[in-house]
Amino acid sequence: MDFFRRTVCFVLCLLLISPVLKADASEQESAIRQDIISYYFHYREKAAKEIENQLHTLTDLNPETGEQWKELMRRWAWINEEMDIHTGVLPDGLPEDDSLCIVVLGYGLEKDGSMKQELVDRLEVALESAEKYPQAYVLCTGGETSHEPGISEAGQMGAWLLENGLEQDRLILEGDSLSTTENAQRSSRILWREYPQVKSIAIVTSDYHIRWGAACFMAMNLLHGGEKELELVGNAACVTDSPNKDTMFSQAWGISIIADIPFDSGRVPPLYMSEETEPPETEAVPMIAAEPIAEVPQKREPVAIVLAGLAGVLLILFVPKKRRKSGSD
């Protein structure tokens, strides 16, 4: 009977502690991923050793997640350090069938619902690209950003393209997103769900916006696309003299939202493995913030210790005490 009680108690303890240990591991993984993004946001390639070290730690905790994030960081670095930005029209060599979708990112409308010139400039690049790749779909993405209800960026963009010669059966509209991050999330889901023939995308937007958009679409498809992942194969930009610029803050913020982890731009992890100890100057955080920045939750003490103590109490309660020797024995 004592053996049975001990066994039941042991199993009960495992059942109590196991979920907490898993939760602790999940929080640890999240913290590591936050550090990886913060390192690249603040230091770029100068934090290569720290990022590599964090990726190794993440892989030890969760091999699948670790390998996924190694690829994410490789692609993110490529987007910022090696990817060419093409102007005027998409480059040569892209798929020439309906496996390609040209994704045109929206831009805030005027108060009356009309399009600003910069958005028209994007559409002119998109139309020329669509003529160069006549089998490709064209997806316009952008929600209601004017004072006129029912008028979306995507709707206005689509109407302009149709008026200027784009075939109706090539046009796809996504009219609910209100940020670049949502452009990537909602557009990707539409293509995954409704256009399985589409395997690759090319982004059309303003010159300062290309890397930001590319980073969001890359992260969305790598982290959530699975077997339906869309390959980013090209880009085309309209040239602007806009004071806006594609900030690393916007990229880091967008990737964090897509990865479902907090992002705190003021959190500066130290460089332990590199010579430089001060982060380079980063762009002012301000600018293009259409959504609230996710708050970083306060770290909680793990409750595994508490449950372990509870398990010990249960052991004491369930295990019978040895009978004391009486004087008559």
Predicted regions and their residues:
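Bacterial N-terminal signal peptides that target proteins for export
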Residues: M1-V8
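Hydrophobic core
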Residues: L12-V20
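N-terminal cationic leader/targeting segments used for protein routing and processing
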Residues: A23, R300, R323-S326
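A structural signal for short, hydrophobic/glycine-enriched beta-strand patches
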Residues: A23-I258
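Low-complexity, Gly/Ser/Thr/Pro-rich intrinsically disordered linker/tail segments
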Residues: W253-V296
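Juxtamembrane/start-of-transmembrane alpha-helix segments at the extracytoplasmic/lumenal side
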Residues: P292-L307
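Core hydrophobic alpha-helical transmembrane segments of single-pass membrane proteins
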Residues: V306-I316
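C-terminal membrane-anchoring or membrane-association module
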Residues: L314-D329
